[in-house]
Amino acid sequence: MLGLDENQPVSKKRKRTVPKSDEKSGRRIHENITRDPVIANSHSSGGQVLLLEKQIQDSQRHYNNIVTLYSLATSQAEEEKQRLAAVAALCRVFCRLLADGRLSKSNGASQNDLVVVDWLKARYADLQNFLLECVSSIDTFNMTALTLSMALIKSEMSNPRTSLDQLWRTGFFSRMLATILESSDNEDLLHKFVDSYAQQFDDVRHYTFVIIA
């Protein structure tokens, strides 16, 4: 499984509870989210990855680059830095696609366009499943996988394809929260979620309580 820089400090285990549901920060996840330095630094990791990402951004003719990036991210044969760069690039790609409405079927769309949307949604599901697998792993990459997952969730909430309430209750967020709660051997993961998200964003805290109630 992927790992971060071994020099990066690992938080000490401590007791932590989800903040009370009536404690308000006045912030929502789609309004702001702190970027993990590892995600930002991945821009400088691997010219091949950046080229593939740019080609996807330039034209849908290069959407097959998504498959290539996914292969790089999941391949045990690739260097750790390259794999991390690839999965971060994939998240940026899908954040843009969500913002552009490319994962939504529009009225009057051609059959070819509908096929493309279905294909993109399938690739997005692949990425989500991979991130959840990483979140559930007992290594330091699960922290970055959590941050990447929350970045995608932010994009989903900013560009909803259905009602926000349904997205929170049944979408990627609910699956990710279940994965965190099932990772009983990794308290640091829960601490990260509580400190960075549940305490910081009203909507994350509210739907955390809604889902676990």
Give the location of each predicted region.
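Charge-rich, low-complexity intrinsically disordered regions
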Residues: 1-213
